[in-house]
């Protein structure tokens, strides 16, 4: 590891993030505005950070995700809320921040060793068709600052409301 930030772009951000999450052993902390699951049974050739997060939770990694309540209020139940529910069923903890101010940050911290900060949401379009930009940091001070912010946002956030099984 190095203390020099590395620039990530549309060609490499999803692969780097997915590899880091696939290797996670202890924690994955995520801030995101939008989380939209890749439909179950649909695979595409690009790396899939959402599936990596879901799989990390299934293998016992402590996954915590904070998303904007604004998304929950404005998008149909088939997108953000259903994606969050899938993560919860996999073993992740998901919380929503109140709509004001809107959480628009996108960051992923893996095992308190790697911090990904960028423009990409957890969505297929961010992987397949958007122009995204970000940075990978492994500086202990930056990671500690992020984790302090994450803890304060986690304390302010509310648990994701769970849908009734069967969608009722």
Residue ranges and their predicted role:
Residues 24-89:
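Primarily the HKD phosphodiesterase
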Residues 16:
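Short acidic active-site motifs
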Residues 89-98:
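A glycine-rich helix N-cap at a beta->alpha junction
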